[in-house]
């Protein structure tokens, strides 16, 4: 049996209008769609009559192994992420699983990364033009990165005067990281530094608030 293919698909911000044509094509030709339950819902209209595998938020590696297993069985698989799959998405973990399994580019399962608009781009478009010059992204999730490392990155970015996009600012169990990030930033930035708080960009529950670093 011939090997299949894995598409690592970035869906963009979430609305079908902002999904790339290549992302649609990848999903259309796929036998199997794998993703976090919330992301599966975003493409519900595009995946009828396909095998759909839904996984929870902390089951990233399970998704990767499922994709590899089916591709080795000859299936075409779309492993989906919101935004861009290479920016806090599934591309990195998938390549780790592939390499650990002995996979090499051009040998066996074919892999294609399908880029999408990441949150830094989508959110910026909704609030004006904050990324005209140098910018950086920092995730506040310490699930895979130690918090002291994240703190050092925040401080370095603040000292360097980057425009900063903070991903994963808080969750139900993780509420203090954003407070600590604010404390660090205030050591190097003015209290009146503008802040845009964007949630669910381009989705039905989109919410945008403007504040300052001191009051965010």
Give a label for each model feature.
Residues 67-73, 125-129, 150-154, 208-215:
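Short, surface-exposed amphipathic charged segments that create phosphate/polyanion-binding patches used
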Residues 1-3, 25-26, 70, 103-106, ...:
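Solvent-exposed alpha-helices and their adjacent loops that cap or buttress functional pockets
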Residues 6-8, 159-216:
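A contiguous loop/helix-start segment that scaffolds small-molecule binding in enzyme catalytic cores
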Residues 41, 86-88, 120, 202-205:
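Short, active-site-adjacent cap segments at secondary-structure transitions
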Residues 9-10, 79-82, 114, 138-141, ...:
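Short beta-strand segments
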Residues 1-111:
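Class I S-adenosyl-L-methionine
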Residues 15, 21, 87-160:
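Class I SAM-dependent methyltransferase SAM-binding "motif I" and its flanking Rossmann-like core
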Residues 22-26, 49-50, 94-97, 128, ...:
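Short, solvent-exposed amphipathic alpha-helical segments in soluble enzyme
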């Amino acid at each position: 049996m011939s090997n299949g293919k894995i598409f690592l698909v970035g869906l963009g911000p979430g609305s079908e209008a902002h999904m790339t044509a290549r992302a649609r094509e990848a999903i259309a030709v796929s036998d199997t769609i794998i993703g976090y339950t919330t992301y599966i819902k975003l493409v519900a209209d595009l995946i009828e009559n396909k095998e759909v595998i839904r996984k929870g938020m902390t089951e990233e590696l399970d998704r990767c192994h499922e994709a590899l297993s089916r591709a080795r069985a000859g299936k075409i698989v779309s492993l989906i992420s919101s935004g861009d799959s290479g920016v806090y998405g599934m591309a990195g973990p998938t390549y780790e699983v592939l390499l650990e399994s002995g996979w090499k580019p051009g040998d066996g399962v074919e892999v294609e990364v399908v880029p999408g608009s990441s949150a830094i781009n989508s959110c910026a478009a909704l609030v004006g033009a904050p990324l005209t010059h140098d910018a950086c992204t920092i995730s506040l999730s310490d699930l895979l990165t130690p918090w002291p490392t994240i703190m050092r990155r925040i401080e370095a970015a603040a000292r360097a005067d980057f425009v900063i996009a903070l991903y994963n600012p808080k969750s139900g169990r993780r509420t203090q990281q954003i407070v600590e990030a604010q404390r660090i930033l205030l050591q190097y930035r003015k209290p009146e530094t503008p802040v845009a708080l964007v949630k669910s960009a381009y989705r039905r529950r989109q919410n945008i608030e403007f504040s300052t670093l001191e009051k965010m």
